[in-house]
Protein backbone atom coordinates (compact mmCIF):
# COMPACT_ATOMS: atom_id res chain seq x y z
CA UNK A 1 0.00 0.00 0.00
CA UNK A 2 1.32 3.40 -1.01
CA UNK A 3 0.82 5.75 1.94
CA UNK A 4 0.88 8.72 -0.41
CA UNK A 5 -2.25 7.54 -2.23
CA UNK A 6 -4.41 6.28 0.63
CA UNK A 7 -8.08 7.25 0.35
CA UNK A 8 -9.54 7.40 3.87
CA UNK A 9 -13.23 6.51 4.20
CA UNK A 10 -15.21 9.55 5.33
CA UNK A 11 -17.47 8.99 8.35
CA UNK A 12 -19.41 11.90 9.80
CA UNK A 13 -19.97 12.64 13.50
CA UNK A 14 -23.58 11.45 13.58
CA UNK A 15 -22.69 8.04 12.19
CA UNK A 16 -19.82 7.73 14.65
CA UNK A 17 -22.20 8.36 17.55
CA UNK A 18 -24.98 6.14 16.19
CA UNK A 19 -22.71 3.15 15.60
CA UNK A 20 -21.11 3.42 19.02
CA UNK A 21 -24.46 3.73 20.79
CA UNK A 22 -26.11 0.94 18.81
CA UNK A 23 -23.44 -1.66 19.40
CA UNK A 24 -22.71 -0.61 22.98
CA UNK A 25 -26.35 -1.11 23.90
CA UNK A 26 -26.40 -4.45 22.11
CA UNK A 27 -23.57 -5.59 24.37
CA UNK A 28 -25.23 -4.23 27.52
CA UNK A 29 -28.58 -5.86 26.70
CA UNK A 30 -26.72 -9.14 26.38
CA UNK A 31 -24.60 -8.94 29.53
CA UNK A 32 -27.43 -7.75 31.79
CA UNK A 33 -28.15 -11.47 32.21
CA UNK A 34 -24.76 -13.13 32.57
CA UNK A 35 -23.55 -16.46 33.83
CA UNK A 36 -20.57 -14.95 35.66
CA UNK A 37 -19.68 -11.40 36.67
CA UNK A 38 -16.03 -10.83 37.57
CA UNK A 39 -15.18 -7.62 39.38
CA UNK A 40 -11.64 -6.49 38.63
CA UNK A 41 -9.51 -7.00 35.50
CA UNK A 42 -6.33 -7.92 37.34
CA UNK A 43 -4.39 -11.18 36.89
CA UNK A 44 -6.80 -13.43 38.78
CA UNK A 45 -9.89 -11.84 37.25
CA UNK A 46 -8.65 -12.06 33.67
CA UNK A 47 -7.39 -15.62 34.13
CA UNK A 48 -10.77 -16.63 35.55
CA UNK A 49 -12.51 -14.89 32.64
CA UNK A 50 -10.37 -16.82 30.16
CA UNK A 51 -11.24 -20.24 31.57
CA UNK A 52 -14.90 -19.44 32.23
CA UNK A 53 -15.49 -18.08 28.73
CA UNK A 54 -13.53 -20.96 27.25
CA UNK A 55 -15.99 -23.29 29.00
CA UNK A 56 -18.88 -21.53 27.27
CA UNK A 57 -20.14 -19.41 30.17
CA UNK A 58 -21.28 -15.87 29.42
CA UNK A 59 -18.65 -13.90 31.33
CA UNK A 60 -18.26 -10.17 31.86
CA UNK A 61 -15.44 -8.40 33.69
CA UNK A 62 -16.11 -4.96 35.16
CA UNK A 63 -13.00 -2.85 35.77
CA UNK A 64 -13.27 0.49 37.55
CA UNK A 65 -10.22 1.95 35.83
CA UNK A 66 -9.71 2.65 32.11
CA UNK A 67 -7.07 -0.05 31.81
CA UNK A 68 -6.62 -3.68 32.70
CA UNK A 69 -3.91 -5.48 34.60
CA UNK A 70 -4.54 -4.55 38.23
CA UNK A 71 -1.19 -4.61 40.02
CA UNK A 72 0.70 -6.04 37.05
CA UNK A 73 1.43 -2.69 35.41
CA UNK A 74 3.20 -1.38 38.48
CA UNK A 75 5.53 -4.37 38.38
CA UNK A 76 7.84 -4.31 41.39
CA UNK A 77 8.15 -0.75 42.69
CA UNK A 78 7.53 0.38 39.07
CA UNK A 79 10.22 -1.94 37.67
CA UNK A 80 8.70 -3.63 34.62
CA UNK A 81 9.34 -7.26 35.53
CA UNK A 82 7.46 -9.71 37.74
CA UNK A 83 8.12 -13.26 38.96
CA UNK A 84 6.12 -16.38 38.08
CA UNK A 85 6.74 -19.79 39.62
CA UNK A 86 5.64 -23.28 38.62
CA UNK A 87 3.06 -24.59 37.98
CA UNK A 88 1.64 -21.18 36.98
CA UNK A 89 4.07 -21.11 34.05
CA UNK A 90 1.84 -23.65 32.27
CA UNK A 91 -0.99 -21.10 32.20
CA UNK A 92 1.29 -18.44 30.73
CA UNK A 93 2.58 -20.87 28.11
CA UNK A 94 -1.03 -21.61 27.14
CA UNK A 95 -1.51 -17.87 26.56
CA UNK A 96 1.76 -17.55 24.59
CA UNK A 97 3.38 -15.29 27.21
CA UNK A 98 7.18 -15.40 27.07
CA UNK A 99 8.99 -16.72 30.14
CA UNK A 100 12.64 -16.17 31.07
CA UNK A 101 13.76 -19.07 33.26
CA UNK A 102 16.05 -17.88 36.07
CA UNK A 103 16.16 -21.09 38.10
CA UNK A 104 14.28 -24.37 38.16
CA UNK A 105 10.57 -23.53 38.39
CA UNK A 106 11.11 -19.75 38.60
CA UNK A 107 10.60 -17.30 35.74
CA UNK A 108 10.82 -13.58 35.00
CA UNK A 109 8.05 -12.08 32.87
CA UNK A 110 7.65 -8.68 31.21
CA UNK A 111 4.75 -6.97 32.96
CA UNK A 112 3.36 -5.23 29.86
CA UNK A 113 3.28 -8.45 27.85
CA UNK A 114 1.78 -10.32 30.79
CA UNK A 115 -1.22 -8.04 31.20
CA UNK A 116 -1.76 -7.48 27.46
CA UNK A 117 -1.82 -11.19 26.62
CA UNK A 118 -3.93 -12.05 29.66
CA UNK A 119 -6.54 -9.58 28.47
CA UNK A 120 -6.30 -10.69 24.84
CA UNK A 121 -6.66 -14.34 25.86
CA UNK A 122 -9.78 -13.62 27.92
CA UNK A 123 -11.33 -11.57 25.12
CA UNK A 124 -10.45 -14.13 22.44
CA UNK A 125 -12.06 -16.83 24.59
CA UNK A 126 -15.31 -14.83 24.55
CA UNK A 127 -15.23 -12.80 27.76
CA UNK A 128 -16.32 -9.17 27.72
CA UNK A 129 -14.15 -6.62 29.59
CA UNK A 130 -15.79 -3.28 30.31
CA UNK A 131 -13.72 -0.41 31.71
CA UNK A 132 -14.78 2.57 33.77
CA UNK A 133 -17.48 0.69 35.67
CA UNK A 134 -17.55 0.27 39.44
CA UNK A 135 -19.48 -2.47 41.22
CA UNK A 136 -20.76 -0.88 44.41
CA UNK A 137 -23.28 -3.44 45.66
CA UNK A 138 -24.67 -6.92 45.11
CA UNK A 139 -28.13 -8.32 44.43
CA UNK A 140 -29.31 -11.01 46.82
CA UNK A 141 -32.25 -13.36 47.29
CA UNK A 142 -33.62 -15.23 50.30
CA UNK A 143 -34.90 -18.79 50.73
CA UNK A 144 -32.27 -19.84 49.91
CA UNK A 145 -29.98 -16.93 50.74
CA UNK A 146 -27.61 -16.22 47.86
CA UNK A 147 -25.95 -13.51 45.77
CA UNK A 148 -27.48 -13.29 42.30
CA UNK A 149 -25.81 -10.28 40.69
CA UNK A 150 -24.31 -6.84 41.11
CA UNK A 151 -25.15 -3.14 41.02
CA UNK A 152 -22.97 -1.12 38.63
CA UNK A 153 -22.21 2.56 38.24
CA UNK A 154 -19.83 4.62 36.12
CA UNK A 155 -16.62 5.19 38.05
CA UNK A 156 -16.64 8.81 36.87
CA UNK A 157 -20.08 9.33 38.42
CA UNK A 158 -18.83 8.10 41.78
CA UNK A 159 -15.67 10.20 41.56
CA UNK A 160 -17.80 13.27 40.88
CA UNK A 161 -19.83 12.59 44.02
CA UNK A 162 -23.11 12.61 42.09
CA UNK A 163 -26.17 10.87 43.50
CA UNK A 164 -27.11 8.52 40.65
CA UNK A 165 -28.81 5.16 41.05
CA UNK A 166 -27.02 2.15 39.55
CA UNK A 167 -28.12 -0.44 37.02
CA UNK A 168 -28.27 -4.13 37.86
CA UNK A 169 -26.57 -7.12 36.24
CA UNK A 170 -27.76 -10.62 37.12
CA UNK A 171 -25.32 -13.51 37.41
CA UNK A 172 -25.25 -17.10 38.56
CA UNK A 173 -21.84 -16.40 40.11
CA UNK A 174 -20.06 -13.21 41.17
CA UNK A 175 -16.27 -13.20 41.57
CA UNK A 176 -14.54 -10.61 43.73
CA UNK A 177 -11.18 -10.07 42.04
CA UNK A 178 -10.83 -6.49 43.28
CA UNK A 179 -7.55 -7.06 45.07
CA UNK A 180 -6.39 -6.22 48.58
CA UNK A 181 -9.63 -4.61 49.76
CA UNK A 182 -12.03 -7.36 48.60
CA UNK A 183 -14.49 -4.57 47.85
CA UNK A 184 -17.48 -6.63 46.74
CA UNK A 185 -17.28 -9.15 49.56
CA UNK A 186 -16.78 -6.32 52.06
CA UNK A 187 -20.01 -4.67 50.89
CA UNK A 188 -21.90 -7.97 51.06
CA UNK A 189 -20.54 -8.68 54.55
CA UNK A 190 -21.63 -5.26 55.80
CA UNK A 191 -25.03 -5.05 54.15
CA UNK A 192 -26.16 -8.69 54.34
CA UNK A 193 -25.12 -9.89 57.80
CA UNK A 194 -27.12 -13.09 57.29
CA UNK A 195 -24.34 -14.24 54.96
CA UNK A 196 -22.12 -14.58 58.07
CA UNK A 197 -19.01 -13.33 56.28
CA UNK A 198 -16.17 -12.38 58.63
CA UNK A 199 -13.22 -10.51 57.10
CA UNK A 200 -10.09 -10.67 59.31
CA UNK A 201 -7.95 -8.67 56.87
CA UNK A 202 -4.71 -9.29 55.04
CA UNK A 203 -1.46 -9.98 56.92
CA UNK A 204 2.02 -8.65 56.18
CA UNK A 205 4.34 -10.28 53.66
CA UNK A 206 5.31 -13.96 53.81
CA UNK A 207 5.64 -14.88 50.14
CA UNK A 208 6.34 -18.62 50.32
CA UNK A 209 3.32 -19.30 52.52
CA UNK A 210 1.06 -16.74 50.88
CA UNK A 211 1.32 -18.18 47.37
CA UNK A 212 0.18 -21.65 48.34
CA UNK A 213 -2.47 -20.57 50.85
CA UNK A 214 -4.05 -18.10 48.43
CA UNK A 215 -4.64 -20.83 45.86
CA UNK A 216 -5.88 -23.30 48.48
CA UNK A 217 -8.39 -20.82 49.93
CA UNK A 218 -9.76 -19.59 46.61
CA UNK A 219 -13.44 -20.29 46.11
CA UNK A 220 -16.94 -19.66 47.41
CA UNK A 221 -17.34 -17.20 50.28
CA UNK A 222 -21.15 -17.29 50.29
CA UNK A 223 -23.67 -18.85 47.91
CA UNK A 224 -23.16 -17.16 44.55
CA UNK A 225 -20.17 -15.11 45.74
CA UNK A 226 -16.54 -16.12 45.20
CA UNK A 227 -13.08 -14.75 46.02
CA UNK A 228 -10.01 -14.87 43.77
CA UNK A 229 -6.53 -13.41 43.92
CA UNK A 230 -5.66 -10.87 46.60
CA UNK A 231 -9.30 -10.71 47.70
CA UNK A 232 -8.69 -14.19 49.13
CA UNK A 233 -5.90 -12.93 51.39
CA UNK A 234 -8.16 -10.18 52.74
CA UNK A 235 -11.13 -12.47 53.36
CA UNK A 236 -9.12 -15.35 54.82
CA UNK A 237 -6.53 -13.36 56.82
CA UNK A 238 -3.56 -14.57 54.77
CA UNK A 239 -0.15 -12.94 54.20
CA UNK A 240 0.59 -10.85 51.12
CA UNK A 241 3.28 -11.92 48.67
CA UNK A 242 4.46 -8.94 46.64
CA UNK A 243 5.42 -8.99 42.94
CA UNK A 244 5.25 -12.76 42.43
CA UNK A 245 2.12 -13.57 40.44
CA UNK A 246 1.91 -17.36 40.28
CA UNK A 247 -0.83 -17.55 42.89
CA UNK A 248 -2.84 -14.88 41.10
CA UNK A 249 -3.22 -16.81 37.86
CA UNK A 250 -3.56 -20.16 39.65
CA UNK A 251 -6.27 -18.64 41.84
CA UNK A 252 -8.06 -17.35 38.75
CA UNK A 253 -7.99 -20.78 37.14
CA UNK A 254 -9.10 -22.46 40.36
CA UNK A 255 -12.09 -20.17 40.90
CA UNK A 256 -13.13 -20.77 37.29
CA UNK A 257 -12.97 -24.53 37.79
CA UNK A 258 -15.00 -24.29 41.00
CA UNK A 259 -17.68 -22.13 39.37
CA UNK A 260 -17.91 -24.38 36.31
CA UNK A 261 -18.46 -27.35 38.61
CA UNK A 262 -20.95 -25.49 40.83
CA UNK A 263 -23.04 -24.26 37.89
CA UNK A 264 -22.96 -27.62 36.17
CA UNK A 265 -24.45 -29.35 39.21
CA UNK A 266 -26.72 -26.56 40.49
Curated annotation (Swiss-Prot):
Residues that hold NAD(+) according to the record: 44, 63-64, 71, 135, 163-165, 230
Top EC class of this enzyme: transferase
GO terms (BP aspect): thiamine biosynthetic process; thiamine diphosphate biosynthetic process; thiazole biosynthetic process
Pathway: Cofactor biosynthesis; thiamine diphosphate biosynthesis
EC number(s) recorded for this UniProt protein: 2.4.2.59
Record field: catalytic activity: hydrogen sulfide + glycine + NAD(+) = ADP-5-ethyl-4-methylthiazole-2-carboxylate + nicotinamide + 3 H2O + H(+)
Coiled-coil region(s): none
Residues the entry annotates as binding glycine: 240
Pfam families tied to this protein: Thi4
Keyword Iron recorded: yes
Cofactor: Fe(2+)
Keyword Metal-binding: yes
SUPFAM superfamilies documented for this protein: FAD/NAD(P)-binding domain
Family: Belongs to the THI4 family.
Subunit structure: Homooctamer; tetramer of dimers.
Biological role stated in the UniProt entry: Involved in the biosynthesis of the thiazole moiety of thiamine. Catalyzes the conversion of NAD and glycine to adenosine diphosphate 5-(2-hydroxyethyl)-4-methylthiazole-2-carboxylate (ADT), an adenylated thiazole intermediate, using free sulfide as a source of sulfur.
Identification of the protein by name: Thiamine thiazole synthase
Taxonomic classification: Archaea, Thermoproteota, Thermoprotei, Sulfolobales, Sulfolobaceae
